[in-house]
UniProtKB/Swiss-Prot annotation:
Keywords: Cytoplasm. Induction: Repressed by LexA. One of its GO terms (cellular component) is cytoplasm. Residues 56-77 are annotated as: Disordered. It comes from the Bacteria. Gene3D superfamilies: Helix hairpin bin (1.10.287.540). The keyword DNA damage does not apply. This is UPF0291 protein YnzC.
Length: 77
C-alpha cells in the first residue's frame, strides 16, 4: 500500500493544481503518484472481492462461478 507521506504529497499537489500554480514537473509527479495509489487501491479491492461470498435472501450461495473459481484457485473458500 502507498505510504502516508505519498498520500500527503498527492494532496499537496492537488491543492497546487487547484490553485493553478503547479509546474509541468509536478504534474508528472502527481500523475505518477496517482497511478501508484490506484494500483494499490485496485489490488486491495480485488483481494477484498476475492473473499466475498454472496448469499440470497433464502440463504442460497449465489456467488458467481468466476469468483468461486478464483477462490478455489487461491484456496479462500
Amino acid at each position: 500500500m502507498i505510504s502516508n507521506a505519498k498520500i500527503a504529497r498527492i494532496n499537496e499537489l492537488a491543492a497546487k493544481a487547484k490553485a493553478g500554480v503547479i509546474t509541468e514537473e509536478e504534474k508528472a509527479e502527481q500523475q505518477k503518484l496517482r497511478q501508484e495509489y490506484l494500483k494499490g487501491f485496485r489490488s486491495s479491492m480485488k483481494n477484498t472481492l476475492k473473499s466475498v461470498k454472496i448469499i440470497d435472501p433464502e440463504g442460497n450461495d449465489v456467488t458467481p462461478e468466476k469468483l468461486k473459481r478464483e477462490q478455489r484457485n487461491n484456496k479462500l473458500h
